[in-house]
């Protein structure tokens, strides 16, 4: 069983957490414990490493940050449960594809187990959907066998800024959030519930 430290970072600027992820990943050793970071960000658009500027329709003065994760542009804001995975994927016997599958399946399991919601994936469009509306976005980076970045689960937030972009590069993609189904949706609970499901899947795969 893998020892994974959880860190609840609270509300943090995206750029600060991004820099911290880079530093953690570049300085870790084979003995460094894996970590999962739980965080919430002030309003920000983040652009993937191959992101196309035309997918940002109108930023409405929301900051735009270029990152090195996979995927296109997405939005982070208050009320969104963000979970970052700082893992040694070789030690966890994970390839890139298996890591993505585990991240996605943990979200599907969580929504089913705790909220009785039947979520699904769409081939070729990473993320988690309910009735073809996207509830969770993911973007990961693996560098020298170490992962960082993660998943963002729309929980109880203002979804309006998603209309300012083509989310994940898809024009007209409809977004949803847990609060559409459960008014009292709470990001702290979602982060803990998700992490429990993820760690269970991870340990079962080792």
Curated annotation (Swiss-Prot):
Domain BPL/LPL catalytic: 30-206
Binding site for substrate: 69-76, 137-139, 150-152
EC number: 2.3.1.181
Keyword Acyltransferase: yes
SUPFAM superfamilies with a match to the protein in the record: Class II aaRS and biotin synthetases
Disulphide bonds in the chain: none
Catalytic reaction list: octanoyl-[ACP] + L-lysyl-[protein] = N(6)-octanoyl-L-lysyl-[protein] + holo-[ACP] + H(+)
Subcellular localization, as worded in the UniProt entry: Cytoplasm
PROSITE patterns found in the cross-reference section: BPL_LPL_CATALYTIC, LIPB
Pathway participation: Protein modification; protein lipoylation via endogenous pathway; protein N(6)-(lipoyl)lysine from octanoyl-[acyl-carrier-protein]: step 1/2
Site (Lowers pKa of active site Cys): 134
PANTHER family xref list: LIPOYLTRANSFERASE 2, MITOCHONDRIAL-RELATED, OCTANOYLTRANSFERASE
Function: Catalyzes the transfer of endogenously produced octanoic acid from octanoyl-acyl-carrier-protein onto the lipoyl domains of lipoate-dependent enzymes. Lipoyl-ACP can also act as a substrate although octanoyl-ACP is likely to be the physiological substrate.
Protein's name in the database: Octanoyltransferase
Taxonomic source organism: Francisella tularensis subsp. holarctica (strain LVS)
Gene, per the UniProt record: lipB
């Amino acid at each position: 069983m893998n020892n994974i430290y959880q860190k609840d970072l609270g509300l943090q600027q995206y750029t600060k957490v991004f820099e911290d992820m880079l530093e953690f990943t570049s300085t870790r050793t084979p003995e460094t414990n894996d970590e999962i970071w739980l965080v919430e960000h002030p309003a920000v658009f983040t652009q993937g490493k191959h992101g196309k500027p035309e997918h940002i329709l109108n930023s409405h003065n929301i900051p735009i940050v270029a990152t090195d994760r996979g995927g296109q542009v997405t939005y982070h804001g208050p009320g969104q449960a963000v979970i970052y995975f700082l893992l040694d994927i070789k030690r966890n016997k994970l390839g890139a594809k298996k890591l993505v599958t585990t991240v996605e399946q943990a979200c599907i399991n969580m929504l089913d187990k705790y909220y009785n919601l039947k979520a699904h994936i769409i081939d070729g469009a990473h993320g988690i959907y309910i009735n073809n509306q996207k509830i969770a976005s993911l973007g990961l980076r693996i560098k020298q066998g170490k992962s960082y970045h993660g998943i963002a689960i729309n929980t109880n937030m203002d979804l309006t800024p998603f209309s300012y972009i083509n989310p994940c590069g898809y024009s007209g993609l409809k977004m949803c959030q847990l609060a559409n189904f459960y008014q009292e949706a709470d990001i702290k609970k979602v982060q803990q519930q998700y992490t429990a499901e993820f760690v269970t899947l991870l340990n079962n795969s080792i």
